[in-house]
Amino acid sequence: MKNLLIISILLISLDVFSQEKFETNKQGSEYKFKVLKDLEATDVQDQGRTSTCWSFSSLSFFESEIIRLKNERHNLSEMFIARNAYMGKAENYLRMYGTFTFGPGGAFHDIPWVIKRYGIVPEEVYKGLSYGSATHKHSEMEAVLDAAVKALAKKPQNGKLTPVWKIGIEGILDAYLGELPSDIEDFNFTYQGKEYNPKTFSKSLGLNMDDYISITSFSHHPFYSQFVLEVQDNWAMQSSYNLPLDEFMNVMEQAIMKGYTFAWGADVSEKGFGYRDALAIVPEDESTIQKSGKDSKRFNDAGAIRVSNAFVSPVKERNITQEDRQIAFDNQETTDDHGMHVTGLVEDQNGTKYFIVKNSWGESNDRDGYFFASFPYVKYKTLNIQVHKDVLSKDLKKKLRIK
């Protein structure tokens, strides 16, 4: 009788194992990923030919937060964020006499910066497509805005700025992205049968922008302190909390396991970043990866073509240290390329863990716009993350002086 019981338990265990869900990165791949956690997210979007990944990724993160907090699904307007951030960039640029950053890039904390000041609207209310295109293309608008702020910085009229310079910049943004009233509370719209303006709609979502923090890991500043991450797109000069690498990785892993997604900023120009192959890895021998063509950073094409068996069969990856990470940042091999959204966690047949990453380049690979980023890749090439502060343990909050 005892033997029969043991056999029954073994058979049940085998049946459960055979039914266990495994994923792979692409057709024909030998990678087998066991799903450890797969959190809800809204539909994959396409940023088009724009450098607004920071807006797409952070808003995707906040859309998942709304699902987590209220079990509601909303598609929020990335171009409403980008448009209002442009005004902030223009003002900063001119206050610094044209010596500061002005451009289409941005950072995760720009989204709270905009929402606190202007609110937010659904995508259907403000699509940002007023130039006869079905997809986002900003090269002309970027050129016009750049020329305008550079001209203003020279103060051509009596050596000072006129009171209407902001109206001029707003006029350019109105033309390309769509008009907004000068008082944002006058922008009234109906959504799902209710009347809102951007601020009342923002309030209805149940998000407290003060609950969200940026975290990074670099040794050129003291750990457990805050510092302004030295990347060009950090125009608002906002700070990130600095953690040792192992703790940083633990925060990311525990966030997912606790049910929290996070926005992820990273370098995506490495040989091992194979979006077409739905895989980001750091092979111990990178010479096995052949790369042809040029990476179009931040845009919605997959960049250079990468060919390697490493994308179809697991290979040994580098053991990334804090020093490796710092050297790559200091020598500018690691660059501030792209914002994405981490929504889950998997483990391959060799025990290596990977984050599930939602991109904003449309459903343009075998994973319908998602890919898997190995822990070594994330250790090596992460710039920073945006996450809810309650992901942190009480002890870590105390160390960082977060209430």
Regions found by a protein language model. Name each.
Residues 28-263, 365-367:
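Active-site nucleophile-adjacent alpha helix/oxyanion-hole segment immediately C-terminal to the catalytic cysteine
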Residues 1, 99, 107-108, 116-119, ...:
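Extended low-complexity acidic/polar segments
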